[in-house]
Amino acid sequence: MVFGENQDLIRTHFQKEADKVRAMKTNWGLFTRTRMIAQSDYDFIVTYQQAENEAERSTVLSVFKEKAVYAFVHLMSQISKDDYVRYTLTLIDDMLREDVTRTIIFEDVAVLLKRSPFSFFMGLLHRQDQYIVHITFSILTKMAVFGNIKLSGDELDYCMGSLKEAMNRGTNNDYIVTAVRCMQTLFRFDPYRVSFVNINGYDSLTHALYSTRKCGFQIQYQIIFCMWLLTFNGHAAEVALSGNLIQTISGILGNCQKEKVIRIVVSTLRNLITSNQDVYMKKQAALQMIQNRIPTKLDHLENRKFTDVDLVEDMVYLQTELKKVVQVLTSFDEYENELRQGSLHWSPAHKCEVFWNENAHRLNDNRQELLKLLVAMLEKSNDPLVLCVAAHDIGEFVRYYPRGKLKVEQLGGKEAMMRLLTVKDPNVRYHALLAAQKLMINNWKDLGLEI
C-alpha cells in the first residue's frame, strides 16, 4: 500500500490489522498433538482466551505465574506460522496495554533465567512480516518505559537501529505511525535519546518527514514531536546541528498553517539553543536558524493571532535571541575587513537578510570602493570559495539595492559573472548562475524568495 493524501490510512492501518488478528480462530490442540507446544502451554493459552474481562485475565495470570510467560515465549518461538505468532504478540500487547504493571511477569522470569526480559522478543525484529516487527516495537516500548528494567547495551542499540530502519522506509512502511508512536514514548528517557542520535537517527527522521509530506499534518507533527523530545538532551541538540534538521523544519515553518505543527517546530528550535550548554554550539544553532531565514518567518507569523501562550512565548524568545546574534555577528565592520583581506568565506553576514537589507547601500560608499573589490575578485581570484561568496554577495547587492543592477554592469560585473558560468567548479557555476539571474531579470523578486 502506498500512501496518498488520506492521512487516515497511515493512522489506522495497524489498528485495523490488529482487529483482524484478534478475530482469528485458533486451534492450539493441533500444536499440542504434534508436540510443538507443551500441555502446560495449551492449558494457559486456552484458559487465558476464555477470560472475559480484565479481572478474570489478571486472575489467570496470577494462577499460572511464570508458566504464563513460558507459554507466551513457546507460542512465539516454537510455532513457525506467522498468523499464530501475530496472534500471540497481539495478546501480549493487549495484556500490557490493559495493565502496564504486568511487564513485571516477564522481568521475574528473566531474572530466574539470568537473561534480559527484552531477549524474549528481540529476535522478532528481523522478521519479514512487518506487523510482527511493529507489534514487537509496541511491546518492547511498554516494557522499556513502564518496566523496572530498562533497555541497555546491545539490545538498546539493536532496537534503536530497527526503529531507524523503519523510518528510512518512509511511506513504503505501512506501519510508520506505529514506529513513530513508539519513539514518542521512548524518547522521554535520556539513554534512549542518546542511543538513537548516535546512530544518525536524525537523518532517518528528516527522511521520514520528507517522505510523509503529502500524508497530512498529523504524521508530520508526530515526527517533529520525536525531534523535539530528542533536543531536550544536550548531546542530541549538538548532534542535530551537524545535519539538516534546522533546514528541514524551517521549511515546514514557512509553509504550514496548522498551529500545533508550528508550535512544535518553534519549540524544537528553542530547545536547540537552550539545551546546548556550550556557547559556541549555541551560536552555531542560532547561525543556522538565521541562514534558514527563521527571523523572517517568525516576523510573518506575528501577524497571526495564536491562542497558545507557550507558542507566543517561544516565538518572542527566539526573535530576541536571534536578533542578539545578528547584531554581534553581522556587523559591517567585520564584513568590510573580510572583503579588504580578500578572504571571503561563508561567515554569517553573507546569508543574513537583515545584514543586506541594512547594509547593501554601503558598498557604494567612497565611490563604490567595496563593490569594486567584489567585482575584482570575480575577475582575478582563483579560489573557488572566494568566487562563490563574491558571486553570492553581488547577487544580494542587486537584490537589496534599487540601482544595484546598473552599478554592477557599469563595473563589468555582469561580464565577469557570465565567464564564471563556464568554469570547471560546479559550486562556482551554481552561485554564478543565481547571481546572473538576478542581474538579468528586471525584478529579482520574480525569482522567488528562496533564491
Swiss-Prot record:
Pfam annotation, one family: V-ATPase_H_C
InterPro entries found in the cross-reference section: ARM-like, ARM-type_fold, ATPase_V1-cplx_hsu, ATPase_V1-cplx_hsu_C, ATPase_V1-cplx_hsu_C_sf
Example of a GO MF term: proton-transporting ATPase activity, rotational mechanism
Entry's transmembrane regions: none
Domain of life: Eukaryota
Keyword line: Hydrogen ion transport, Ion transport, Transport
CDD domains for this protein: VATPase_H
GO CC annotations on file: vacuolar proton-transporting V-type ATPase, V1 domain
Function field: Subunit of the V1 complex of vacuolar(H+)-ATPase (V-ATPase), a multisubunit enzyme composed of a peripheral complex (V1) that hydrolyzes ATP and a membrane integral complex (V0) that translocates protons. V-ATPase is responsible for acidifying and maintaining the pH of intracellular compartments and in some cell types, is targeted to the plasma membrane, where it is responsible for acidifying the extracellular environment. Subunit H is essential for V-ATPase activity, but not for the assembly of the complex.
Subunit comment: V-ATPase is a heteromultimeric enzyme made up of two complexes: the ATP-hydrolytic V1 complex and the proton translocation V0 complex. The V1 complex consists of three catalytic AB heterodimers that form a heterohexamer, three peripheral stalks each consisting of EG heterodimers, one central rotor including subunits D and F, and the regulatory subunits C and H. The proton translocation complex V0 consists of the proton transport subunit a, a ring of proteolipid subunits c9c'', rotary subunit d, subunits e and f, and the accessory subunits vah-19/Ac45 and vah-20/PRR.
PANTHER family noted in UniProt: V-TYPE PROTON ATPASE SUBUNIT H (PTHR10698), V-TYPE PROTON ATPASE SUBUNIT H 1-RELATED (PTHR10698:SF1)
Protein family: Belongs to the V-ATPase H subunit family.
Protein name: Probable V-type proton ATPase subunit H 1
Species name: Caenorhabditis elegans
Source lineage: Eukaryota, Metazoa, Ecdysozoa, Nematoda, Chromadorea
UniProt gene name: vha-18
